[in-house]
UniProtKB/Swiss-Prot annotation:
Disulphide linkage map: none
Native source organism of the sequence: Pongo abelii
SMART domains hit by this protein: Transket_pyr (SM00861)
SUPFAM superfamilies documented for this protein: Thiamin diphosphate-binding fold (THDP-binding), TK C-terminal domain-like
Binding positions for K(+) per the UniProt entry: I142, A190, I191, D193, N195
Xref: Pfam families: Transket_pyr (PF02779), Transketolase_C (PF02780)
Record-linked InterPro entries: PDHB_mito-type, THDP-binding, Transketo_C/PFOR_II, Transketolase-like_Pyr-bd, Transketolase_C
Transit peptide: 1-30
Enzyme nomenclature, EC number: 1.2.4.1
Keyword Electron transport: no
Name this protein carries in UniProt: Pyruvate dehydrogenase E1 component subunit beta, mitochondrial
GO cellular component entries: mitochondrial matrix; nucleoplasm; pyruvate dehydrogenase complex
Length: 359
């Protein structure tokens, strides 16, 4: 009460100054956006921007998508642009490819890329090869997107990574986002591209929130296809990855930093065309290389990176052989303990890095 009465006796201006001193402004909290919402936002902006863009796939319309990635789009754009299809990947992928040849820009969603094998003829023979076979006269501006790679408890037929499969095929562009910024920027670039683009998302990342920088909130935000990003600077070893394992690599780098090992972590973002310039420049700086992926080891993304390093100028800068961290060379088991041991974990990445550095 004494403090209050003291304030009452003071002139009003002085009281105002005293009260102001008790408060201070803090920077606003960074906007957090999930990967799911980032993809949704990117598709929404492109649907609004270009009336030739439309989305089709199983349960993408009234149900808002099996993973709710297309939430709200059917209510906003209606039946003509958000189209539910029968359970026939070969059928609706063929419709989408034909629409692209006719001048539209379809987004073809596979409920999982494991099911894209049902439509492989449409993706490879019709979409990927037509521009070449027509002598550049017939572009096929189509996006094939959906979850790729390991999920949780969905076993052998729903857990495969197709990065190497589609990255193998000329005529396709293949992107593999990790965080929300990647997801929005790459889906928008894919939709605007005049070539067929495969967008390999990850089911386990859909609900993960990431800081969303102001530039990513713009409707003009794009991430160029074919350009990697250095997520963490380092001097001792280069660690290259894509999709969900990028997060594991950053966790491993944080652990090793406490031991005096500084890892340079590269988020590939694009599988094809691969940004070898960024990878080579990093290897020339660190003199060591580890690749990390969730797919099988033989003929994988890591194998391609290692081969190109061996064939290129960075090879002479290596102080030790490059090491790959991959999924196990088996179909994905159902039991959780076996599943966990079939995909790269943080401990596996740390082990590989220490092996490469001989520590």
């Amino acid at each position: 009460m004494a403090a209050v009465s003291g304030l009452v006796r003071r002139p009003l201006r002085e009281v105002s100054r005293l009260l102001k001193r008790r408060f201070h402004w803090t920077a606003p909290a960074a906007l957090q956006v999930t990967v799911r919402d980032a993809i949704n936002q990117g598709m929404d902006e492109e649907l609004e921007r270009d009336e030739k863009v439309f989305l089709l796939g199983e349960e993408v319309a009234q149900y808002d998508g099996a993973y709710k990635v297309s939430r709200g789009l059917w209510k906003k754009y209606g039946d003509k642009r958000i189209i539910d299809t029968p359970i026939s990947e070969m059928g609706f992928a063929g419709i989408a490819v034909g629409a692209a040849m006719a001048g539209l820009r379809p987004i073809c969603e596979f409920m999982t890329f494991n099911f894209s094998m049902q439509a492989i003829d449409q993706v490879i023979n019709s979409a990927a090869k037509t521009y070449y076979m027509s002598g550049g006269l017939q572009p096929v501006p189509i996006v094939f997107r959906g979850p790729n790679g390991a999920s949780a408890g969905v076993a052998a037929q729903h857990s495969q990574c197709f990065a190497a499969w589609y990255g193998h095929c000329p005529g396709l562009k293949v992107v593999s986002p990790w965080n929300s910024e990647d997801a929005k920027g790459l889906i928008k670039s894919a939709i605007r591209d005049n070539n067929p683009v495969v967008v390999l998302e990850n089911e386990l990342m859909y609900g993960v929130p990431f800081e969303f920088p102001p530039e990513a909130q713009s409707k003009d935000f794009l991430i160029p296809i074919g350009k990697a990003k250095i997520e963490r600077q380092g001097t001792h070893i280069t660690v290259v990855s894509h999709s969900r394992p990028v997060g594991h690599c950053l966790e491993a780098a944080a652990v090793l930093s406490k031991e005096g090992v500084e890892c340079e972590v590269i988020n590939m973002r694009t599988i094809r065309p691969m940004d070898m310039e960024t990878i080579e420049a990093s290897v020339m700086k660190t003199n060591h290389l580890v690749t990390v992926e969730g797919g099988w080891p033989q003929f994988g993304v890591g194998a391609e990176i290692c081969a190109r390093i061996m064939e290129g100028p960075a090879f002479n800068f290596l102080d030790a052989p490059a090491v790959r961290v991959t999924g196990a060379d088996v179909p994905m088991p159902y039991a959780k303990i076996l599943e966990d041991n079939s995909i790269p974990q943080v401990k596996d990445i740390i082990f590989a890095i220490k092996k490469t550095l001989n520590i």
